[in-house]
Amino acid sequence: MKTTVIVPVYNRPDSLVLAIRSLIRERNAVDMDILIVDDGSTDRTSEVIQNLADSHPEIRAVRRDNGGVTKARNTGLDNLHDETAFVTFLDSDDTLAADRFATDMPILQAQPDIALTYGNMVATTQIDPLTLRPVQGAAQKEITGIHLSCALMRRSLITRIGRFDETLIQAEDTDYLLRIFETDTRFVQTSTICHYYLRHDGGMTQDFDLGRKYFARAVMKSLQRRKADPTRKLHKPTFDLMLPPELI
């Protein structure tokens, strides 16, 4: 049973290499299938992807016309391996934490009724390219964030929830997680550090006004769904919604 990690990327050749290295480091923990979705990159990202795929049989790549991260995530879902049983995501500028799969996968393997595990992330301003961890002395904070990389999901859950909402160009992950936690989905909240989330000027979420707009839209959609269907109730982990000033 394969674990597919969907990695959408657009014009991030250098950080993509670090992200993939962090995944390859964990390939002995699961039968890993790394699916890189190139969202129409215009720089050397496509060349880097080809080199990575040539070097690592775990890597598959699909290229699409540029359409934004939401459509790229859906392209990933459309291209799951026939043997995929578990799914998670990793953004191209983040890195997977060591032992992320070794820690949480046994929970899903031992409890077939659990649809996903949900852990923590560390937000930071700088990743060490050697250790693939936050640089010593860099601003960092462990939080339970609203982030897809914190979730390790059964494919059956993905099938039930469906595709990402392509009307959202941001906060599509918030919307997707809310759609999961609005239903009676059995999950285990863990203390596992799942990934290191890089905050930087080039990050899409740096546009706070736009980010707040789409976050509010995702929350409103959740409220509307629950109002229309009283059986939908929010059963969610305890999310941390605020970052310290040095990480904003």
Task: Please describe what each predicted stretch is.
Residues 83-95:
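Short beta-strand-to-loop acidic/aromatic patch adjacent to the donor-nucleotide binding site
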Residues 22, 38-47, 66-67, 91:
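A conserved acidic beta->alpha catalytic loop
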Residues 2-4, 33, 175:
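Cell-envelope/extracellular polymer assembly enzymes that use nucleotide-activated donors
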Residues 21-31:
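Short, acidic, metal-binding catalytic loop of nucleotide-sugar glycosyltransferases
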Residues 170-176:
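Acidic donor-binding loop at a coil-to-helix junction in glycosyltransferase catalytic cores
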Residues 44, 94-107:
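Acidic donor-binding/catalytic loop of UDP-sugar-dependent glycosyltransferases
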Residues 120, 187-194:
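Catalytic beta-strand/loop signature of glycosyltransferases that borders the donor
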Residues 56, 69-71, 77-78, 101-157, ...:
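Flexible acidic/His/Gly-enriched loops in nucleotide-sugar-dependent glycosyltransferase catalytic domains
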